[in-house]
Amino acid sequence: MSNKFLGTWKLVSSENFDDYMKALGVGLATRKLGNLAKPTVIISKKGDIITIRTESTFKNTEISFKLGQEFEETTADNRKTKSIVTLQRGSLNQVQRWDGKETTIKRKLVNGKMVAECKMKGVVCTRIYEKV
């Protein structure tokens, strides 16, 4: 994994997030809170363990994993998923599976910013973060 991912990132723009949350099955009240949140994402690495901590006024979440190894995750909207993160062509690609459903979150670096592309049932959401 590129060390360029490591550090603290602040959300600066979000496109189609409400539709993405709807596709995930997130209820209206949680979607409203999610749309208001401007999360900070902290990515760190210790040995071969990567940690992604997301902090917002709505909720804090943290996942720690080894690339290519499945782990259990409880998402910010309380889904219990089996997740796996891989590194492909410089992108951190996360797949979450639960109840026969699947979503992907692809994080890549573009012009010094971290771009997270989230996909579910044909809905694509793009969230852009700047390094703090």
UniProtKB/Swiss-Prot annotation:
* PTM-bearing positions, type N-acetylserine: S2
- Record-listed hexadecanoate binding positions: R107, R127, I128, Y129
Q: Name one GO molecular function term.
A: fatty acid binding
Q: Which GO terms describe its biological process?
A: fatty acid transport; membrane organization
Q: Where in the cell is it found?
A: Cytoplasm
Which SUPFAM superfamilies does the entry mention? Answer: Lipocalins
| UniProt comment concerning the protein's domains | Forms a beta-barrel structure that accommodates hydrophobic ligands in its interior.
Q: What else is known?
A: P2 protein and myelin basic protein together constitute a major fraction of peripheral nervous system myelin protein.
Similarity section? Belongs to the calycin superfamily. Fatty-acid binding protein (FABP) family.
Relate the protein's function as given in its record. Answer: May play a role in lipid transport protein in Schwann cells. May bind cholesterol.
Q: Which disease is the protein involved in?
A: Charcot-Marie-Tooth disease, demyelinating, type 1G: An autosomal dominant demyelinating form of Charcot-Marie-Tooth disease, a disorder of the peripheral nervous system, characterized by progressive weakness and atrophy, initially of the peroneal muscles and later of the distal muscles of the arms. Charcot-Marie-Tooth disease is classified in two main groups on the basis of electrophysiologic properties and histopathology: primary peripheral demyelinating neuropathies (designated CMT1 when they are dominantly inherited) and primary peripheral axonal neuropathies (CMT2).
Q: What is this protein called?
A: Myelin P2 protein
